[in-house]
Amino acid sequence: MSMAGWITIGIFFLCVLALTRPLGGFLVSVLEGRRTFLSPILGPVERALYRFSGVRPEEEQSWSHYALALLSFKIVCFVAVYAILRLQAYLPLNPAGQGSVAPDLAYNTAVSFVTNTNWQSYGGETTMSYLSQMLGLTVQNFVSAAAGIAVAAAIIRGFARRESKAIGNFWVDMVRATLYVLLPISVVLSLFYVFEGIPQTFSGSVVATTYEGIHQTIALGPVASQEAIKMLGTNGGGFFNVNSAHPFENPDALTNFVEMISIFAIGAGLTNVFGRMVGNERQGWAVFSAMSVLFFVGVTAVYWAEAHGNPAFSAFGIDQSLGNMEGKETRFGVAASALFAAVTTDASCGAVNAMHESFLPLGGMVPLINMMLGEVIIGGVGAGLYGFILFAIIAVFMAGLMVGRTPEYLGKKIEAREIKMTMLAVLCLPLVMLGFTAVAVVVKPGLAALSATGPHGFTEALYAYTSAAANNGSAFAGLTANPYWNITLGIGMMIGRFFVIVPALAIAGSMAAKKIVPPSSGTFPTDTGLFIGLVAGVIIIVGGLTFLPALALGPIVEHLSMLRGTLY
């Protein structure tokens, strides 16, 4: 662990902190329909979209209509992406002559990008045409992220409004998030990435001759534009198979730093949106503070584990001064790789600049735990905030039980309906993560995909289903997905996305209809250090202890075995 590494982590956090309030203010203006500096340019486009699609922006929706609109849109998106992938061989912009995608892989990929997971059971440069990458996958990177922002906005309105049946209009929220937030920032990021050397071309692959006289095919494509929204929208699906470890996706330390900032930017800004819209900015900073505490715990743990190197190698006299460099790029090193791993799994991004499977057992366990906690540490675009609010509801419910009074959050009483919806959303994740893993490690198709045995093989399976249910998309790359995995992972992605969103919207509708209760001497304050500690504790206890037995069978046992000289 070096001073340079800690300085990198510190500067990264300060940059995120500096962006939180200004970006939060801009997001509030966009979501509330106020005039912004982009309105003269994009206002006519927004109004034209409403006229063309028949949307009446002044008409708001109840939570059930909001959820129905979202689910209907997602079904259309799934069908569109699936059709593009299945017909790929007959569509233009396919200079490499890629064939049509197999049915199970097309299903898995369509579900993956529609749910903002971006799990990839394929290598992008060897499977997808340029049209599929742009029209199919990149479009979903925009609209899936916009849907997350829309849901977060709807839930915030649920707490901010009183005696209201409406929580907003899904179509309006999604259009505004796409037009005013995601597209403009992505354009700026794309230009920066092109300047840094990331390709943006429709030309086909280039054949080069190496120093050894061997011919090598170098894949190109419209990479920069996809890279921008891939990070900003916490999507994570790479244009190339090795994702952001590829020099054409992430060429140097500067692009690596900007990509990490992009992952956290909107999620951090939404915490400020929360505070502003409920009328108390301190509430937003309390949420951000709780997330930050958990972030530093995680990044410290993974950095410590990777910086100390592999003790089994040290026994052979191998120099470990650089830490565990297996699976890492020398242009980034251990510190930047550890930070990237923490950031991408704190958010539901899933992009990687190093191979998580090559991390040491405890180092690989940290990204796994981040996902098991529901990725509420900043989290995915929108998803992190509403996931955190679910845990905040549990925290104030527990606090209410301890003092013998009806729990309240932001002046709204937390009653049986809200607790039932919260537990439905919270419990569906471990059900998928643990249940599907248990089945996969005892059936032949499940075992056939694993490249390792023992605890490491178990961790491969556990990581895959955890990543799918958490809508992250990163993987222990030794797993070779077959039709069994493609189908079951797709099911896990849908449950992890929509079995959280729908209960969260139901809570928003219920809270919007309630009166705001004036605070009293018995009201539990939710903008103090006590609340921050309580929520962090609930996240660790409720989220973490659920998975302790599974972690004991995987990375913990593997770590203890490694100390005795046994590697997997």
Curated annotation (Swiss-Prot):
Keywords: Cell inner membrane, Cell membrane, Ion transport, Membrane, Potassium, Potassium transport, Transmembrane, Transmembrane helix, Transport. GO terms for cellular component: plasma membrane. The chain crosses the membrane at residues 7-27, 65-85, 136-156, 179-199, 254-274, 285-305, 332-352, 354-374, 377-397, 423-443, 487-507, 530-550. It is found in: Cell inner membrane. It is a multi-pass membrane protein. One of its GO terms (molecular function) is potassium ion binding. Coiled coil: none annotated. Part of the high-affinity ATP-driven potassium transport (or Kdp) system, which catalyzes the hydrolysis of ATP coupled with the electrogenic transport of potassium into the cytoplasm. This subunit binds the periplasmic potassium ions and delivers the ions to the membrane domain of KdpB through an intramembrane tunnel. Belongs to the KdpA family. NCBIfam families: kdpA. The system is composed of three essential subunits: KdpA, KdpB and KdpC. This is Potassium-transporting ATPase potassium-binding subunit. It comes from Granulibacter bethesdensis (strain ATCC BAA-1260 / CGDNIH1).
